[in-house]
Each structure stands twice: as C-alpha cells, then as structure tokens.
C-alpha cells in the first residue's frame, strides 16, 4: 500500500525478472493512496535537496514505477501515464539524481505509446552519464601523467556501464537510427578506458553496436568497430592455438570454439552490409585459423 507492505494470506509468486520486488500490488487501491501523498516543495528549485531527501526518492521512484507497470499490464495507459508524470513532476531528475532508477521509465513510456517522452528521457539520462564520462575521458587524455586512474576507476566503470546499458536497451527495441549518434559518442569518449578494462573485455561488449552503425549509414565507423573487435578475437584465437599442446587441451579447445562462435557472429553481422570481397577475405582468414587449430 503506497510505501509500506501489508501481510496478507495470499501467496504471490516471486518475480523472476526482479526478485527484490516483494508481494503484489492492488493498482487501484495504491493509486488512491499515492494521489493523496503530500510532496511539500519537492519539485521546487528554491530548496536544498539534501542527501537524505534524495535518497528517499529511491523507494518512491521504484514503487511508482511498479504501479505504472501494473496499469500497463491492465491496459490502463491513461493512469500509467499519470503516475509516470507524477514521478517526474514531484521528483525532477536534476534535483533527485539516482539516475539509474529512472531508466525503466523509458520502457514504460514506449509501452504506452509516448515515443517522444521516452526519447527525451533517454537523452536527459544520456547527458548525465556522458557528462561524467567526458570528465574522466578528457582528464585522462589531457593529464595522462598526473591523473590518478586508480582513484576514479570505480566511477569510470559505473558510468560507462550505465551508458552502455542505456544504449543497449534502445538497440533491443530496434531503435537503431535514434541510438546511432549515442553509439558514436560512447566509442569516442570511452575508448580510452580500454586500458582499464583490457582491450578484449572493452571491445567484446560492443558487438551489438556494429549493426546499428551500418544501418544508420555510418559504414566506416561500423567497419572500424568490427575490425577492433575482430582483432581482439583473432589475437585470442592465436594465443589459444599456441597453447594447445598444454596438458589441458580439452579446456583450450572449448575456449577456442567459444571464440570462433563470436568471430562467426561478427561475420554474420557484416555480411549484410559489406562488399563481398571484404567479407570473403575475412571469412577465409577465419577458416584458415580454424583449420590450423584442428591440424595442430
């Protein structure tokens, strides 16, 4: 009920997608309670939103989103929109922060047909993450000798992964054109972090970014990203091949097969967008590596 739980003799299955969401919601009852909440001056630009106030928004945002999703499931898009709007009206993004808690609302906006609002929220969150990433990225580039990477590594990982996740959610929805500029921004400002991640780990998580670049007409950038990812996989394949004679050859063969699967996935992506000669050349090189491993 609102912000509290009531113990009732009803068994509710655990939500496998989010096991932290306990119990069930009676949306109309909760709606009546939520509409009676007194927010004070929460949306005012003239007050200081102290850390505890902002921290309390975690529960409010989470529960309001749950309520909105229940209305969406019931097909009541009008009330779902009302709750979503209430959330951002009373807890403006700029004042309450904890940006990751607002990310699920993008999907909710899409579900109720509010495309423009969904994409506006995406852009607002993107700016928050990208501002942080730019600070660390430019600091590393301009003050390489004195920038204390170890002191900020956790923040770098956090904002990079949040930004990447934000982009991947749009890719899963098929919004390739819309998100293409964001992909270019991501690569431009985070590529310097590959020294922190390790080049292989940095690039391998960008496989899903290749196709949107091609589809949006950024063929040169798409090929460049393909090459960077492919070179990391090929290097890993060569390393595994050189170690095949070790006693743990079965394990190495399994690792090799996994990397080959990743390489073939890359080829399937570019096949639809690259000229035949380029694709054939890449395919032959991969087949040669595979044959050398088998015959060794």
Locate the predicted segments by residue:
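ER/secretory pathway lumenal C-terminal domains and tails of membrane proteins involved
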Residues: 1-296
């Amino acid at each position: 009920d609102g912000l509290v739980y009531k113990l009732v003799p009803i068994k509710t299955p655990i939500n496998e997608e989010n096991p932290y969401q306990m119990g069930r919601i009676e949306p109309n009852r909760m709606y009546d309670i939520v509409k009676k909440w007194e927010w004070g001056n929460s949306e005012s630009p003239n007050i200081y939103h102290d850390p505890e106030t902002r921290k309390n928004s975690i529960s409010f945002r989470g529960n309001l989103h749950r309520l909105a999703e229940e209305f969406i499931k019931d097909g009541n898009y009008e009330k779902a929109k009302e709750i979503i709007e209430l959330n951002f009206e009373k807890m403006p993004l700029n004042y309450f922060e904890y940006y990751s808690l607002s990310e699920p609302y993008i999907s909710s906006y899409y579900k109720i047909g509010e495309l423009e609002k969904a994409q506006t929220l995406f852009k607002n969150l993107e700016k928050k993450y990208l501002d942080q990433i730019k600070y660390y990225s430019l600091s590393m580039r301009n003050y390489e000798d004195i920038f204390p990477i170890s002191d900020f590594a956790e923040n770098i990982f956090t904002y990079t992964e949040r930004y990447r996740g934000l982009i991947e959610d749009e890719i899963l929805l098929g919004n390739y054109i819309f998100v293409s500029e964001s992909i270019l921004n991501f690569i431009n400002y985070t590529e310097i972090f590959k020294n922190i991640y390790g080049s292989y780990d940095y690039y391998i998580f960008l496989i899903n970014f290749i196709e949107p670049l091609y589809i949006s007409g950024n063929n040169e950038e798409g090929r460049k990203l393909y090459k960077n990812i492919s070179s990391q996989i090929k290097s890993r394949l060569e390393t595994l091949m050189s170690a095949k004679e070790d006693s743990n050859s079965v394990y190495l063969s399994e690792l090799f097969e996994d990397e080959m699967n990743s390489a073939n996935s890359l080829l399937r992506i570019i096949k639809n967008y690259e000229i035949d000669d380029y694709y054939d050349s890449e395919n032959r090189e991969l087949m040669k590596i595979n044959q050398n491993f088998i015959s060794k």
